[in-house]
Amino acid sequence: YKNIYDGLNLGVNINNKGILNKPFLYGITPIYSVNSNTLTGFVKVKHNTYFEDKNLYNINFGMSVTYSSFAKNAFVTKAVPYINFNFRDATDLRLNQLKSLSLRYVSIEKDFVEVENDKSIAPPYNVFNIRYIDGFNGFKKYHNWFLDAQFSDQFGKLSFNYEIRRRSN
C-alpha cells in the first residue's frame, strides 16, 4: 500500500540474515513518515529445521505482520502465519528438483478514520491458502507446476499452473 500523504518515508531494516542458513531469522523494519507523522512498518520471524538424509529436508514456519497506511488517516494490518514443507531426493542431492507444500493464513484488517472520497467499508479479509509446487530447474530442461487452493468465508478458488522450457541444441 502506497500513500502519497505520508511524504518522505524513513526506515531501517534490522535483521539477522546472513550468507549461511540459520535456524531462526527475524526482520524488523520501522518506517517513519515525515508528512503524516506516523510510524508504520513490518516484523518477520521464521524458524528453519533441516533434516539430513531425508526426502523431507526442510520445514520452516513463521509469521509476518505489516502495518501500513493506504490513505490519509487510514491504515491496514496484514498478518500472515505460514508453514512450508520442502522435499528433495535424498539419494541424489545434485538433482535440481523442488517439491514443496505450503500452508498459510492471510488476515487483512483496515482501520478507518474518516477517509475522504471513500464510501466503502471493508470488513476484515481472511483467506486460508494451501499450495503444492513440483518443479525441475535443469539447464536443458525446465518444468514447474503448482496447484493452489484458497478458501474464505465468501469464496473458494482453485488454480493450476504449468510452465515448461526446453533448450534447443
Feature locations, PLM:
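Sequence/structural signature of outer-membrane beta-barrel proteins
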Residues: 31-35, 50-52, 66-72, 90, ...
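Active-site-proximal structural scaffolding
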Residues: 7, 76, 153-157
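A short acidic (Asp/Glu
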Residues: 37-41, 74, 157-161
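Outer-membrane beta-barrel initiation region
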Residues: 1-57, 84, 89-97, 104, ...
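C-terminal outer-membrane beta-barrel translocator/porin domains of Gram-negative envelope proteins
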Residues: 58-71, 84, 129-133, 140-169
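A residue-level signal for beta-strand positions that form part of recognition/binding surfaces
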Residues: 60, 80, 100
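Gram-negative (and chloroplast) outer-membrane scaffold detector with strong preference
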Residues: 78-84
